[in-house]
């Protein structure tokens, strides 16, 4: 059980749910510039496994690192933090 706590966990926004059992999650992080100290925003997209196809476009989700599930999938959906409001 202690090994499971060492897995990376990211929170991001679902930007694509068109694939079957797969979502694309955009994770935004801030890094401080080493010389100037300014915080710079970085973003990266991760593909995550969604077994029940429950996450929808715009949802805020938490993804957890797992074994390689395909050529590009290394994460799985852990929980839906906030559902998107459709207007």
Curated annotation (Swiss-Prot):
UniProt GO MF annotations: rRNA binding; structural constituent of ribosome
PROSITE patterns assigned: RIBOSOMAL_S17
Gene3D superfamilies found in the cross-reference section: Nucleic acid-binding proteins
Pfam families in the cross-refs: Ribosomal_S17
Keywords linked to the UniProt accession: Ribonucleoprotein, Ribosomal protein, RNA-binding, rRNA-binding
Protein's UniProt keywords contain Protein biosynthesis: no
GO cellular component entries: cytosolic small ribosomal subunit
GO terms classed as biological process: translation
Keyword rRNA-binding part of the UniProt annotation: yes
Quaternary data: Part of the 30S ribosomal subunit.
Family of this protein: Belongs to the universal ribosomal protein uS17 family.
Protein's job: One of the primary rRNA binding proteins, it binds specifically to the 5'-end of 16S ribosomal RNA.
Protein's UniProt name: Small ribosomal subunit protein uS17
Gene name tied to this protein: rpsQ
